[in-house]
């Protein structure tokens, strides 16, 4: 894969994507061939997977495969899997013990490599795998270092650890701790075939009334000379982490994306005239010390997915107001905007719109009216699988009924593979069998990650039928939805792992 010169490509992409956000009411629910459709799979507290601690290897694998089947049926094209929820790991690691959410005992080997297994199964289905890290959090419900596994890095470096509320965290302001966190992420990037590194909204912890995060001593040691106040120093600590992670990822594998899903409000307009027209009680900039604007403007992330977990028209923080505000934040920037959707609130919240079956549909419809919103991330799979107010059905039969490719990121790579050869289309009792052969140059460079198969009936416009992961230089695809009485033209393209598509090879049935 060819990787472009960063500065030149970022400038060109800015020209391409620097368009005004417009509404297109008559295309309200139109599905695009390009849209991220991702879902979070949380491991912390066994929210999504594994469903409980101590399952056998066979049970864990069966559960994950079943979840992927559910994801496919809903028309998704990416999963965001939490692989480091509490300074631990779902893979053998030099930077954290085995997670207790696997076996019930922190540090206990589960008997296989869950991350390798998950990536393999995910890619079989041609879904993206976003590896989800929580950088600072060490515990969920205690502050006793002695309860951690004996080999836990936090026990070896207690000076890196801060207790706040009833939890332990790595100090964001200690350079050695920051380097350690980054190396832990680098370990995964280098050793596993992930598509993206993902972080959520947990940076400095959400504030607790009457309690100050205990980092005054660290500020005196590391920050006082450069920063006149502790808040600016805290923001710089997070900014440095974000930049360092991105630089480390790109040095190892330039095609691996880096994205963050922050809290839904940067600042209120009352705090900053360029902030959103909201009255949120929590703000990224002021409370979590997460300056999302800085990351976007510095090009330190490839995507941002604000968690806009409120209804359209909600007084304190309206979904529609924030979706538009975030669209303006990424305008003219080589950063994709996805929206974090609150599936967990459907029919489960005090705010009346969440009891309306159409609220979630309206939110996704609104996203599609905003040109710079490139898709959605849903929290979480467990909630979607409950099918509240029929949302799972709505996704599979309506909103996501047609497949979609993940949007390209031309600032990372904009060179498409050579087109494959659709050598034959054979009709049989099971449907139409397509025989696909990759272009010889793609075989040498391993450019092709998957094939996109399109179909046109008669003189109608072609539509995306499916995608298929490349497994061999020659492989087949069965269209079992074909009507034997109709004539079709099939088009096949090769796509690389950043979703750049080749020209199409085509054949028509007799």
From Swiss-Prot:
Keywords of this entry: Glycosidase, Hydrolase, Signal
Phenotype seen when the gene is deleted: Cells lacking this gene show up-regulated sigma X activity.
EC number(s) given by UniProt: 3.2.1.-
Residues annotated as signal peptide: 1-30
Hydrolase found in the keyword field: yes
One of the record's GO molecular function terms: hydrolase activity, acting on glycosyl bonds
Classification via Gene3D superfamilies: Glycosidases, Immunoglobulins
Top-level class of the enzyme under EC nomenclature: hydrolase
Record-linked Pfam families: GHL10 (PF02638)
Family the UniProt entry places it in: Belongs to the glycosyl hydrolase-like 10 (GHL10) family.
Name of the protein this chain belongs to: Glycosyl hydrolase YngK
């Amino acid at each position: 894969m060819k990787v472009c010169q960063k500065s030149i490509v970022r400038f060109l992409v800015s020209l391409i994507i620097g368009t005004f956000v417009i509404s297109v009411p008559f295309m309200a629910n139109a599905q695009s061939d390009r849209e991220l459709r991702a879902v979070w799979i949380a491991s912390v507290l066994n929210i999504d997977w594994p469903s409980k601690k101590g399952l056998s290897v066979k049970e864990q694998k069966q559960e994950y495969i079943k979840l992927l089947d559910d994801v496919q049926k809903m028309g998704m094209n990416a999963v965001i899997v939490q692989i480091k929820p509490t300074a631990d790991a779902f893979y053998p690691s030099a930077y954290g013990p085995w997670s207790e959410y696997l076996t019930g005992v922190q540090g206990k080997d589960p008997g296989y490599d869950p991350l390798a297994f998950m990536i393999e199964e995910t890619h079989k289905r041609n879904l993206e795998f976003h590896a989800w890290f929580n950088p600072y959090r060490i515990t969920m419900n205690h502050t006793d270092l002695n309860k951690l596994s004996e080999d836990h890095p936090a026990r070896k470096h207690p000076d890196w650890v801060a207790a706040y509320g009833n939890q332990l965290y790595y100090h964001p302001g200690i350079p050695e701790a920051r380097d350690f966190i980054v190396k832990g992420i680098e370990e995964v990037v280098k050793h596993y075939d992930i598509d993206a590194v993902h972080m959520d909204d947990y940076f400095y912890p959400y504030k607790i009334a009457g309690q100050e995060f205990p980092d005054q001593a660290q500020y005196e040691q590391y920050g006082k000379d450069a920063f006149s106040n502790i808040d600016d120093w805290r923001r710089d600590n997070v900014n440095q982490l974000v930049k360092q992670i991105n630089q480390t990822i790109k040095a190892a594998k330039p095609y691996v994306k880096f994205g963050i899903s922050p809290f839904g409000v940067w600042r209120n307009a009352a705090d900053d005239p360029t902030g959103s027209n909201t009255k949120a009680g929590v703000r990224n900039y002021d409370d979590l010390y997460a300056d999302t604007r800085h990351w976007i403007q510095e090009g330190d992330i490839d995507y941002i997915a604000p968690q806009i977990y409120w209804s359209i028209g909600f007084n304190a923080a309206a979904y529609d107001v924030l979706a538009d505000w975030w669209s303006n934040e990424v305008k003219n920037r080589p950063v994709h905007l996805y929206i974090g959707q609150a599936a967990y609130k459907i029919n489960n919240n005090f705010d009346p719109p969440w009891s309306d079956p159409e609220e979630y549909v309206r939110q996704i419809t609104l996203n599609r009216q905003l040109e710079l919103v490139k898709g959605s991330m849903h929290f979480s799979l467990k909630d979607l699988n409950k099918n509240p107010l029929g949302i799972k059905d709505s996704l599979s039969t309506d909103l996501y009924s047609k497949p979609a490719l993940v949007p390209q990121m031309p600032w990372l790579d904009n060179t498409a593979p050579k087109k494959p050869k659709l050598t034959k289309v054979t009709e049989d009792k099971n449907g139409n069998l397509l025989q696909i052969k990759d272009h010889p140059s793609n075989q040498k460079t391993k450019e092709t990650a998957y094939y996109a198969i399109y179909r046109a009936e008669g003189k109608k416009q072609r539509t995306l039928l499916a995608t298929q992961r490349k497994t061999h230089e020659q492989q087949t695809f069965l269209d079992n939805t074909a009507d034997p009485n109709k004539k079709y033209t099939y088009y096949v393209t090769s796509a690389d792992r950043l979703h750049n598509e080749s020209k199409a090879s085509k054949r028509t049935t007799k």
